[in-house]
Amino acid sequence: MELLSASRGFLKCNFHCHTTCSDGRLSPKDVMAAYRALDYDALAITDHREVTRPAADEIPAGLMRIPGTELDFLLPTQAVHLLGLGVSPDIADCWNPNGTPQQAIDSIRACGGRAVLAHPAWSLNTTELMCSFRGLSGVEIFNSVSSVPTNALRGDSAAMLDPVFANGQLLNCFANDDSHRYEGECGMSATMLNTNDRSVAGILRAIDEGRFYATQGPEIRELSLTDGVVHIACSPAKYIIFYSNEVWIPNRTRALEGQTSADYVVSPRESFVRVQVVAEDGKSAWTSPIKLG
């Protein structure tokens, strides 16, 4: 089963950022220009509780704008922030800020959007809460602004997501900047969509089909599952690491400087496998969890 293939091409995307229409420091026009200058192909402006709609002549050539918003809740011991990607402007009227996060997920979907759980490590989200959600299209495995130098080291949510995956909630993984200040976090990460369809419909279709990976820079070029073997091809890596619901599996970390591929034989006890590629500079790329069995 082919999961990712370089033959389909990749689009470099950021699905989480803010402008002066909410709590960002740059105008929508300047934000879009900044991301296009960094070779991003698609951008979702996700201002809080509204859908920002820049004028057509403000959108740089070569950049596809995906409608978006961010809905937020503060619970007694954690926050919940939800991205609505591809959502219609009606979301501002059809969600209830005094309701529940699940109701917000339902509202995003009712308005044609895809709901993505943002920065769960930063938000202190529990396994129980994340497993309770229904209708999510994914989760941020990495969020740039939740890490240094703009925040504490809560940008990487990978370790806390494995218990969620192990309990059957297999969520596709995004990496987004969540840019606010534009003081270094812009361009720190990307979600790489495995499609050459640059339309809004094509981008949302790739999200629906899970054809993407999350990255701080390293490339994943091929990913497949065939006869119980996970195969990955990537840019030169220091480590290629295979994670699953099993706490002890031999040979799950491949440490060979400059390696560009690895194979992993799954065991009958494993319900999912995900892969992390770590480059020599310490930056990572992550696949989504692959369902087994």
Predicted segments with their positions:
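C-terminal functional module detector
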Residues: M1-F10, D30, N167-N172, D177-G293
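A metal-dependent hydrolase metal-coordination microenvironment
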Residues: E2-A118, L124-G135, E140-P163, F174-N176, ...
